[in-house]
Design a protein with these regions (language model features):
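Alpha-helical transmembrane bundles and membrane-interface segments of multipass inner-membrane proteins
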Residues: 1-189
């Protein structure tokens, strides 16, 4: 897989890089998480902004015909880092359990490292699939409900929380199956 600077400097990739940089103010804002509700709203607003940039970068990449190998790496990496920052900080504050954080981190780490392995073997980056995107969306909803301080015992919170756990496991299994299929196809060529 060969990339050049034109492959990197696209509108959609720059939006993904912006999302990467949002991790810093998100991390820092959590230092004052318990000081006021205003901080919750700032974190919430940055999370919504990150979600909007995620939607926009994919839309613009397709619309402007700027789908690049670099973008296939940067976009999910930005998603994983931004999500990890928020979930790590929420777990550190006791707002989300550490096993939930562990599930997300282990899944994302295996998918990332597996993606590097598959890319090296087949010579191209596997794009994200709909199940992975849906999983990030559901985890994002759990994060937003947590930031809005929705009661953890409420039906609304529990539906999204337990559904996200199911999605984390299913999307991991789907990624393993998909990677294996690509590797098997490569052996047949």
């Amino acid at each position: 897989m060969k990339m050049n600077h034109k492959d990197f400097f696209t509108v959609s990739n720059l939006l993904s890089v912006l999302r990467l940089f949002l991790a810093v103010p998100l991390w820092l804002l959590f230092d004052n998480y318990n000081s006021s509700a205003t901080v919750h709203y700032w974190i919430f607003a940055l999370c919504i902004f990150a979600a909007i940039t995620d939607i926009l970068d994919g839309f613009l990449a397709r619309k402007l015909n700027q789908v690049t190998e670099a973008g296939k790496i940067i976009d999910p990496l930005a998603d994983k880092i931004a999500m990890a920052v928020v979930v790590i900080r929420l777990a550190m504050l006791g707002e989300l359990p550490f096993y939930y954080l562990s599930l997300i981190v282990v899944r994302d780490l295996f998918i990332f490292l597996g993606g590097i392995y598959v890319t090296n073997k087949i010579g191209k980056v596997l794009p994200s699939n709909i199940l992975g995107k849906a999983t990030v969306l559901i985890i994002g909803i759990v994060v937003l409900l947590t930031l809005l301080q929705i009661d953890k015992n409420s039906l609304l919170f529990n539906i999204f929380y337990y559904f996200s756990i199911i999605m984390i496991v299913l999307s991991f299994i789907a990624y393993v199956i998909r990677a294996n299929e690509y590797l098997q196809r490569k052996k047949l060529v």
